Amino acid sequence: MFQPKKPANISLFSICMALILFASCTVVKQYPTNKPFVFKNSINVDGNISKDEKKRLELNLQNYWDDSLKVKMVTQFGIRTVIRNPNVYDSSAINSSITFMRSFLNSQGYYDVILNDTINIDTVKNQFRTTVLMNVQLGKNLTIDSLAFNFKSPDLQKIVVDNDKETQLKKGRPYSKQIIATELDKLVTLFRKNGYYRLNREDLVAVVDTTDISLLEITLDPFEQARQIAEASERRRLNPTVDVTIRERDTTEAFSKYYIGNVFYYPQARINDLPDSLMQMDFNIVFTRGNKTSKQNSPFIHFKPLDEHTYLQKGLLYNEERYFKTVNALSQLGTWNQIDVRTREITDTIHTLIPGDSSIAAQVRVDSINMLNFHFFLTPAQKYAISTDLEVSRNSGTILNGNLLGIANNITLRNRNVWREAIQSGTIIRNGIELSLANNTPLQTFQSSFSHTLSIPRLLAPWQSKRIQRLDAYKTVFNFAAAYTERRNFFRLRSVVGSWGYEWKKKNNIWLYKPLNLELYTLDTLKGLVAAFEKNPFLRTAFNTGYVVSQTLTFNTTFAGSKPNVSNYVRISVEEAGGLLGFIRSFHNKLYRYIKTEGEFRQLRSFRKTALAYRFFGGIGYNYSNDPKVGQSLPFFKQFVAGGPNSMRAWPLRQLGLGSSLVSDTSTTFKDRYGDIQLEMNFEYRFPIATISSVKIGSAIFTDIGNIWNLKNTVTNANSKLTWNRFARDIAIGVGSGLRFDFNYFLVRFDFAFKVKDPARIKNNGWINISDFEWRNKEFEIKGTDGKLLKRNNYAFQLGIGLPF
């Protein structure tokens, strides 16, 4: 009898060995024959510094090689290195490289530096491969001994003193030109927030002094002078320090304060209009309120949206932060494609009454002040826009149908200026089907939906707070949706959803609160689902129908990591349903009562050409109604699912879990799994392969770890409940790789993943057995309703749009 195990193992071993050999070699193409060429360069930094500082310096110093010593290296398939047209080695380039590197190190505060080069030439056939190693020995880094701000203007000096806690120039901190430049930039920003409109970086100067103050003491003894000089030299060698003084340059125009004047809006400006011409033009509709004026030729926009999103109040000091906040707020309304701003400097007068006395009459003092008028030229976006999108997704390896192909079409109609209030309206009509490629009846799922959203650029509430001015953006959102979904032979689901909520943003923090979310569902159970209920009674608890009246709160934020190449994303969501209405008797047996929370953390570490991405997700939902009519678990449309192109990619969509239960895997009917708890971790290493025309081709190596579970104990499906003594057994692990085709506007992703640890695998505690490797799980045979043997693959192919996370 033919045994496929041994050839499979040999093939797998051969593939691994071939990949190792393929990755370990560096190929040189179009090299100069019989001449030494630059094959490799490297930098080694030694000194009393931290590992992170050593790594930073070595990475940055790579940019300071002379051009003729740089290696023209290309990475193929993420693992193979190719050098094309290498430079002929030129020994004179060593000196220029040392000069460049020394200048960079000086700018970082390292002055006592020794650089030595080592040259090795290896002969490979007719190749003279030259390796250049630069050894860098660092002395002690300069540290800041003192910091002083010496501004002649009392106003500038007061601003700096009031904010000196924010400075990074602290005593004992390492000195570098970069930290000085950063401090000057912060001061410019600080001054421009306090009225100094014309001030820029060139108007400030930082004086760095390394003089030992003890040398300034007067002494007539030449031996004492020699001793002081020797001691000062030794102190500089052991502990080199600098004194930093920041002051203004000798200019006057930049240090004049400016105040906010008038604001003018031109909401119908065209892209080719000249701003100076528009400012001189007469308009049919001119509306003024306070210091703000809107100029239009025809009714286009009401004044209120412009006024509410402008943060420039007349008479206040010019504040660059509030200026940019205004520009961003108007841009985010969505009614205009482009916003251009012109400022005009004017001089105004202030009359101050000076009271007199019995001997001197009262006087009026006239002072001149500088003011700024702002002219906003807003180019409208196309009011109506219609678009259509085609979505395609595929996941293979499913137990039920072999291969599933999803196709959906979205038609979107947008109105960017409803009722001339800058209200954004979006209507989406979606129709989709799910096809089985290995079934006599290909159509498995049909879905049709209609949704409409109104986004109003203000917070509609019975009260108003001045705190709203502190927000960067805010809006009220109304949403309505109706959908129909039919799973062949299993169910027909109809739903109507309506919600009202508020969304606001402060810096990188975004909040979304929905005080009212109403969801109505009706479910028709067909014969396939009825049969599944008979074999798996636990499914009934999830497929009961009821109403959802809930409120939700979602928070998400992005923030930088401890290093500049690290970015983080956090999302937390809480939903509560039926808390108060559930006490009303008329809602018994109709209303779901539950609380559901979920959290997500993502981190991206970007390197020169590659990236490392992590994702951690956890969610739990608890049904506290204990009403048998609406079930003891979350409704299935609120439960968690795993598998598919964006979650646990070694499993098809909704085909992982629950826990290590085999109920769904051994069933010949309904295979979808829904859980009250989900835990998942994803790790992905992304790297480029090639660029063909304008299409960037990349790849990734990834692993997915997680599962879904029931929260409450189910007698008929005990292994579906999360328990700590079975937690390790329940965890699923998949590994894989894939291709990504980046077309700039969208990304198409093909992923292949293998089940390294499958909770539904009985043998070896779920782990794959390398010595008994199989592409399919043959532990037990399952026949479908047509009598054919159903396949349980240990792998899955996924087709997705965009990155998985």
Residue ranges and their predicted role:
Residues 2-13:
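Bacterial N-terminal signal peptides that target proteins for export
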Residues 393-401, 414, 512-697, 701-726, ...:
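C-terminal outer-membrane beta-barrel translocator/porin domains of Gram-negative envelope proteins
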Residues 21-24:
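C-terminal motif of bacterial Sec signal peptides marking the signal peptidase cleavage site
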Residues 2, 26-332:
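Interaction-mediating elements
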Residues 47, 134-140, 151-153, 244-248, ...:
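Flexible glycine-/small-residue-rich
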